[in-house]
Swiss-Prot record:
Keywords: Metal-binding, Ribonucleoprotein, Ribosomal protein, RNA-binding, rRNA-binding, Zinc. GO terms for molecular function: metal ion binding; rRNA binding; structural constituent of ribosome. Its cofactor is Zn(2+). This is Large ribosomal subunit protein bL31. Part of the 50S ribosomal subunit. The keyword Transcription does not apply. The lineage of its organism: Bacteria, Pseudomonadati, Pseudomonadota, Gammaproteobacteria, Vibrionales.
Length: 70
């Protein structure tokens, strides 16, 4: 490997909006602000909600479903 061409690799702080902080190795020199992390993301916390919004087919059937029953 050539000397002096690679960026510095050091510890960087990451801070989530929920208040959780952790340290990881990166070439970034500034702290990283995150929107979600593994402590507050719904997938990892088990607080997922099922989306029950109807799609285009349901919308079509609501509008025109009664016409086909004549």
């Amino acid at each position: 490997m050539k000397q002096g061409i690679h960026p510095d690799y050091s510890a960087t702080n990451a801070r989530c909006s929920c208040g959780n902080t952790f340290i990881f190795q990166s070439t970034m020199t500034k702290d990283v602000n995150l929107d979600v992390c593994d402590k507050c993301h719904p997938f990892y916390t088990g607080k997922q909600r099922q989306a029950s919004s109807g799609g285009r087919v349901d919308k079509f059937n609501k509008r025109f479903g009664a016409l086909g029953s004549k």
